[in-house]
Amino acid sequence: MYVNQRQNCDCGSPVYEVAFCNDCNEPHLLARDKKGKLVQWENKGGDEFSLQDEVPVEHDATEEKVEKENSFQPPLIIAAGETSEAGYTLQRLDRQTRRIGVINNDSIPLIINDIEQVCSASGCGYRGMSGKQPFRRALLGGPFYVTNIVPTVLEYCQDFTSDEGKEGVGPDSLPGRGRRLITFTDSRQGTARMAVRMQQEAERSRLRGSVVEILSWHQRTQTSTAPNANADLEKLAARAKQAREQAEEYRSWGMPDQAKLSQAQAEQLEQAYQAATGGKAATILVSRTWTEMVNELKERADIRGPVLQYNHYLKPEVFNENGGPLKLSEMLLFREFMRRPKRTNSLETQGLVQVGYQGLEKIHKSPLHWQEKGLTLDDWRDFLKVTLDHYVRESNFTQLDDELKNWIGSRFSSKFVRNPESKDPEDNQNRRWPQIRNGNVSHRLAKLLMLGAGFKTVNAATIDIINTWLKEAWAQLTGPLAVLKPDGNRFYLPKEHMTFSLITDAWICPVTNKILDTAFKGLTPYLPTHISFEHLTLAQYDTFVAQKVTMPEIWKLDRSQEDYAEGLAKARDWVSHDPLIAQLRSENVWTDINDRVVEGGFYYRTAEHSAQQSSERLQSYEKMFKNGQLNVLNCSTTMEMGVDTDRVMTLASRSQQATIPGPEWHLNDELVVRSLGYKTVELNEFILPAKATNAVERVKDIQIHKQLNGPLSQFGQRFWDVLFNDHEEAQSLMNNTRITGVHYTDRYLQNPVALALLGSILRPLKTKLTDGAEVTLDTLFKDKDRPGNRPFHDWMSIADFQDFADQWFAAALGRPVELTVFDSPRDIPHHRKLTVTFEDGQVLKIRFDQGMGYWRINFSSQWHYFDFRDDVSFQLVKMAQACKEGNVANSEESWATDVLVEVIAS
């Protein structure tokens, strides 16, 4: 597996994109058949801001999305191994030429489906739903990286200090402790969206930390039940047993409220007995209702202060000083818990908080035939909990005030659920409660009941029992338990019926590797769309079973008495030494997201600094930035020089500052970070020794204007002659030492002219390469709106571009070239650099100011037209013929281009 796009594996085999089944998570490879060659699939990732968004495809797909998905050219699917799924056939692939159907010693077998997109896993066969593709691509965009990196960079920035040493607002009273950072984005629209995304992630981080802090405080401060020395332990044990028996009796009598009281008394007495005898008492988890949690959140300093100020700026009539904190707390809490996500990171999926529902504690009877199948009342309670988590909430059967819907940061459409026997037609807003209809057992709840009860066949008797259980679930949730609330003849889950508590025991989902706080009969709710119950083997059943785990007692971490830095260190030390966390981390269940939540979360304030903003607003942002009220200014590259940084903060950019003249000119770091926030060290004058008369200058800046003009066939040799005339050490190294590696990186090689010029420069190196020398090229491919028709125009097809480049450079250098094509400028530095590595370990580094773009090629009139629609083999022939008569000319009459040449010793 490679995390960056590349064409070939180290073993020489072609590399294709990996994707995972949206249903069972089975890995597959995506490719494209191009005239008998298996090349990489071209389809881009789309909007990188929505790559991590999770939309319930069963309920939320729209016709617009279907049309967009279907407009993509579908890929060929390569299975990981043998499969019985229809459409998959065994074919052989030549590793070098990538041609399909070639049988030789260098060909490899592949299981390929070129008919339809379907999962190859045995018993899955997922084909997607509602027009969505069945496979999930493993793509991460810039927004994901930036929102994860920024809090870490801010951590190493300096806390705010007053300019003039005055007593005033300190770091504890400012967002992000007043730390400051400037980021750069290379598009104005991207600047605005990145600023909003960072702000939402900062709000999520602080909300998660606050929820866990509130629940932990209540868990720590619950009344101790340890008895004194006078307690009669035998009587204590007997009364605990009696209280539990009373609870069971009350349930059997249909008195759930009394049963709840007796159950609570039994748990407290059992805990007291364990404490007195030195045993391990079962933890009684404290829960808070929705209303209680909202009321505590609105009193939090961050939410009443900087978070409210930011949202007040967006919608002052909603987030005002009076009712604003309450509405803001509701909005933040709803954003986190409106759905129970499948794979997205949340407090639930990370195993930190579990959601409960008021009314479930009243359960006192199970449905007809339930106990006959070996199922208990606790199993029924688990099933109803799973139903509310993974059907009701996941289907958006919840409600939110219209004035808050626009501010939760994701698409949300409230829906209602109706009686399972309703005859009214369903629509986008109204659904019937699930039943097995027309023998279709594909609904999640029906499959869970089939597996949990051990049914092996789907017949009329089985369907009647399952439907009876589903109707009983509806009857209890809308009747005596009153978890769902009516609106006419439609029902929904009021958010006020949700409760929150920490977690002690949980399950690891075998499909998502996320935490499930409740699992009916230990089963994952994320079952394959179609299950053949008649042919279900024990091995297949085991793939549905979740792994039970014990979660760490995070409430025992109390850092409320420490200063900020000491408290942070205490939290990290506690996390690093907890054995349960170490085990969960080894299984990739406990991640850095959990760490940050346990640390309390980190809120920072961000703003867009671009030409889209008014000058008054920009000045306001800059003032807030200087005063520590704004932590991150997200600038467009056209605006960053307008910010008066004034010794304030840290600058961070992906190679932006490194590619313009200035203090970081010619730095090679991909991420340039320059901090002015700390006090400068004391400087002492130092006199440099005089340059020796025979000293060798290893770095030279060479000006090239018209020296390389002339026939293209001699362009490369003229280039090296000019360099060697000005750099004798480079000439000596090239003449006397063999080359073991050549690497060139340049974003702008997407047209035939650029490839021809670069090929001409590299061709003279052919005779100096060792047999095992590696030649690698890195470049960028950008989508184009319309096709070109001139040699200096860009390719629209990335596959054609790669195919042309591979063969062009292989012909020039007499060996295959490893070409890596990126689709995002964030993945490749902006500089244009040629690196030549020699056998003795020395390196020749050549940096171009304008790269190949400084020169143009004048072709004869018959070669002015270039047909990009032609087969690549014809494109290669025509370009080679055109280059024979082509002449190179510099494109700028008034100025030269800089080429920096440096020899680096081994």
From Swiss-Prot:
Protein name: Putative uncharacterized protein YjiV
Organism (species): Escherichia coli (strain K12)
Upper classification of the organism: Bacteria, Pseudomonadati, Pseudomonadota, Gammaproteobacteria, Enterobacterales
